[in-house]
Amino acid sequence: MIDLTIKCKEKVPSRAFVVGYPIHHSKSPKIHNFWLKQYGLQGEYLAQEVKLEEFSDFLTSTKKRGFCGGNVTLPYKQEAFRLANYKDEVATMIGAANTLWYEGDKLCATNSDAYGFSANLDDSAPNWVGETALIFGAGGAARAILYALKKRGFERICLLNRTRQRADNLAEHFGKPVEVHDWHNVGEILYEADLIVNTTSVGMTDPHGWKTGSLFCDFQKTKTTTLVTDIVYTPLTTPFLQQAKAHGLRTVDGLGMLLHQAVPGFERWFGITPQVTKALRTKILEDMGEERG
């Protein structure tokens, strides 16, 4: 398990933020405010919509604004990493930051996406173990997944991406056991994979991508014990997961990763380790239903 739960060294105001542009889509305020209410804390967690040209000034002035830290969402994760005074190993390997906090006047950064991914697997598929993983995609999300799987001790991590060069770059950055494969031998890897992860937006932006070629995955070639997960959570059960289920495979949706990645930040800012519960999941699902409705 990746340990991102070290608390700030000093007592800081219980006021945190999530910053992005746009920000209205973010579920973070509902997650953190749910926990604040659940644990009877008097803190605040506020959404901050900041334009690109204003982001640097915003981030460097957050302590003066009374914030003890916050989350960073699209499109600023890489810029937040660059601006932070201290970056831990996780953020450095992933090359992006989504969780910030202060130690004195020093702005510190980590990335909790890898933690969220691992915790979601442990929560949704307890006692599951594997040695070989197949990952679709080589974007920012894939970097977090690669870090998580290396930390979990996977012996083989196979990477497939439409643009091979991006996958090659990631394999060079992370080193063994990451290896890049071409689409023509995906069938062989499918049979060997204990875990299949979709880190692309296919299923959200291209509902039929799994069968038209943008993300083709023949689940008939997998082992019956293979676990399949998709980091996309809108829709909750993506076409990718639907097909895996249709072939009797165990699946894990992406909502749990979103919920679990929020845990380390909340603990840093408010001093309590929150629990990802069925009640929280239900609350966020209700909110998603309201937005779709």
UniProtKB/Swiss-Prot annotation:
Record-annotated residues binding NADP(+)?
Answer: E89, G137, A138, G139, G140, A141, N161, R162, T163, R164, Q165, R166, I231, G254
Q: Name one GO cellular component term.
A: cytosol
Name the family the entry cites. Answer: Belongs to the shikimate dehydrogenase family.
Recorded protein name is Shikimate dehydrogenase (NADP(+))
How would you summarize the oligomeric state and partners of this protein?
Homodimer.
Q: Which Pfam families match?
A: SDH_C (PF18317), Shikimate_DH (PF01488), Shikimate_dh_N (PF08501)
Q: Which GO terms describe its biological process?
A: amino acid biosynthetic process; aromatic amino acid family biosynthetic process; chorismate biosynthetic process; shikimate metabolic process
Q: Which HAMAP family match?
A: Shikimate_DH_AroE
The answer on whether this UniProt entry bears the keyword Oxidoreductase reads: yes
Q: What does this protein do?
A: Involved in the biosynthesis of the chorismate, which leads to the biosynthesis of aromatic amino acids. Catalyzes the reversible NADPH linked reduction of 3-dehydroshikimate (DHSA) to yield shikimate (SA).
Q: Which terms are listed as keywords in the entry?
A: Amino-acid biosynthesis, Aromatic amino acid biosynthesis, NADP, Oxidoreductase
Q: Which CDD domains match?
A: NAD_bind_Shikimate_DH
- Annotated positions binding shikimate: S26, K27, S28, T73, N98, D113, Y233
Q: What is its EC number?
A: 1.1.1.25
Q: Which residues form the active site?
A: K77 (proton acceptor)
Where are the bilayer-spanning segments?
A: none
Q: Which SUPFAM superfamilies match?
A: Aminoacid dehydrogenase-like, N-terminal domain (SSF53223), NAD(P)-binding Rossmann-fold domains (SSF51735)
- Which of the seven top EC classes does this enzyme belong to? oxidoreductase
- Which Gene Ontology molecular-function terms are recorded? NADP binding; shikimate 3-dehydrogenase (NADP+) activity
This enzyme catalyses: shikimate + NADP(+) = 3-dehydroshikimate + NADPH + H(+)
| Pathway entry | Metabolic intermediate biosynthesis; chorismate biosynthesis; chorismate from D-erythrose 4-phosphate and phosphoenolpyruvate: step 4/7
Task: Tell me where on the tree of life, at the top rank, the source sits.
Answer: Bacteria
